[in-house]
C-alpha cells in the first residue's frame, strides 16, 4: 500500500511539472514567430484555444486530485457522500443550465458568463481548501501544490474569459457576489467532518471544472462548425 502511495505521489509530481511547463505564463501568448505578446493582441481564435487549453488542464488536475484524495483519506464506506455532495455544491443556486438540452439552447453570451461565474465562485473556496489541507498530518505536498496551481490557473482563466467577453460580445461583465458561497467554510469542523467537507469541495469543483471545459468547447464549435455542435 505504501508503495502504491509513493507511486501516486511521483505521478503527481510529473503531472504538475508538465502543467507548469505548458501554462507557466497563461496570458502571455506566442505569435507565429515565437515572440511573447499580450493575449489582448492575439486573434480571437487563438485566445479561445488558449482558454480551452487552460480549462482542459484544470479539469484534468481536479479529476486526478479528487481521486488521489479519495484513495488516501476517504474510506470506501463513506464514498457515497459524493452523491450528496453533488446536491450541495456552492454553485448549485447559480442560474447555469445543467442538462445537455438546456446547454445546447443558451446563447454565446450566457456560455461565457456562466463560465465566468463558475471560475470566480471557486477561487476563494480553493484558497480556503489550501489552508484546511495544510492541517492534514499526512497530506502529501503534491496535493497542496496542486490546489495552489489550480487556484492560480483559475485566476488566469478568469482573465482570459474576461478578454473573450470583450472581444466576442463587446460588453462589460455581470457582477457576481461570492460572499454567500463562502459562509459554509467559516466553521472549523472535526477531523471526519473536515475530510468529508474537503472531499465534497473537490468533487463539486471537478464537476464544475468539467462544465467550464464543455461550455468553452461548445462555444468554439459554434464559431467553427455550426452544423454539428453536440455535447457528448
Curated annotation (Swiss-Prot):
Localization per record: Secreted
Main localisation: secreted
Keywords, ordered alphabetically: Disulfide bond, Glycoprotein, Hormone, Secreted, Signal
A single MF term (Gene Ontology): growth hormone receptor binding
Any GO BP: positive regulation of receptor signaling pathway via JAK-STAT
Domain of life assignment: Eukaryota
GO cellular component terms given for this protein: extracellular space
Family: Belongs to the somatotropin/prolactin family.
The protein's name in its UniProt record: Somatolactin
